Amino acid sequence: MQLEIEFKKDFEQLKSEFERHNLDLNEDYKKIMYAILKEIVKSRKVRLKLNSTKTPFIPQIQLSIEDILRLAELDNTKENEKLVRHALFALSVYHYQFIYDTIKLDDGSYKELNYYIAYTCVIFYIKKIYDEDNNIKYYEIEPSAYVLELFKEYFVVYQNH
């Protein structure tokens, strides 16, 4: 089931949230990550996950390698296709640590904390969809829990162990 939603943050606001964390990504990987984020915000499509333990509405897009090259404004070459595959791997397998020592209050001001909050996660959850010849047809891409929290209308439920 697909629904359409309105995000409370636009792409530029999300991009600035990521820039604050100074992610250890090369410029090409960042360009690809931002192209995907921009498409998630632009598409406003969500997939209903009724049995989800986190949130039932997960933004999801389906992109082929060619789509990602176009969105990232990269030439359609074998080298750039390989670059996209490597970036998708890095964004969906490697874990990044986000550390906070301040929190943003409702009035927009910041408050310094007496402690640090560290969050480690991937950026995207990515599933490869293959055609009948066993070639990748497209990727189903969903933001991770951390990225969902950046959208601000999402809340993520964590299990208490």
Where do the model's predicted regions map?
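Charged, alpha-helix-forming regions
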Residues: 1-161
